[in-house]
């Protein structure tokens, strides 16, 4: 049996990377939005949610933007794999892939960086207070999954960089 044509292999690789990005972003979203802790400070218990940390709100926004773009690109890629034709005629789809992948990858990495930085900053302040260590660990886990989603999108960005000069 002959190997598939390179164009089909690259289309399938792009589809797999987009699906992996989607999975990592969904996992990051679930971990982040379910992140709560109870702080015990001088006989007072305070319930802390992820939305109380500004950087986690930014992480949430980057995850939602990344998910919206990834779902759109999965639909475009599925159509391309199934039919061999792009949704948009001309070079519009390639340019959209090129610029979209670049912008989204930068958005995702800034969200991950904000998550890591804020988690590192608040860790020494509240360490050992109630179940705050679990809150910290979930923050790191969510930021890590977001970073892995960025890596998948960055690889897709390289693929779209190679595809654009071939068509333009």
Curated annotation (Swiss-Prot):
Extracellular side: 33-57, 119-144
Keyword DNA damage in annotation: no
Subcellular location: Cell membrane
GO cellular component terms given for this protein: plasma membrane
Spans within the Cytoplasmic topological domain: 1-11, 79-97, 166-168
Keywords, comma-separated and alphabetical: Cell membrane, Membrane, Transmembrane, Transmembrane helix
Protein family: Belongs to the Casparian strip membrane proteins (CASP) family.
Protein name, UniProt field: CASP-like protein 4D1
Organism of provenance: Ricinus communis
